[in-house]
Amino acid sequence: MTFGRVALLVGVAVLVLVANVAASILYMVVYSYVIDPGHDPQYYNDHIQAAAPYCSIVAGIPLMFGAGFWVAGWWRRALGVRAAWIVWLAYVLIDLAVLLVAGMSMAVALLFGVSFGTKLAAAHFGARLRLARPAEPAAAATSAQL
């Protein structure tokens, strides 16, 4: 795998990370305006600290599944699942670096371990689903005629 390909996959990991953070922000907006309005900002800051790992798990599974599905079709079949794993690995390294700098408790570390595991499974199964599907119906019809 070339450096350019890995750079593209790291870019996908960053997109997934940004989308996951956006999902947490959206959750917090809905929570603060609809579910439990009327508190001071510190209340909501404390709440998102507790809720963020769960948001990461819930939103991260479909995001990473989609990323795995997407990148598995970029190059030949042999690189499909490997590309999804590289996206996951880049995501984990970036997210883990941020968490270590921010300082996390053991409970949060356990939840993020679960989050990383579910994301790996999602990326893997997304790539496997993409590879299990026929490439293009027109190509299959052409090869059947030969």
Placement of each model-derived feature along the sequence:
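Juxtamembrane/disordered regions of integral membrane proteins
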Residues: 1-146
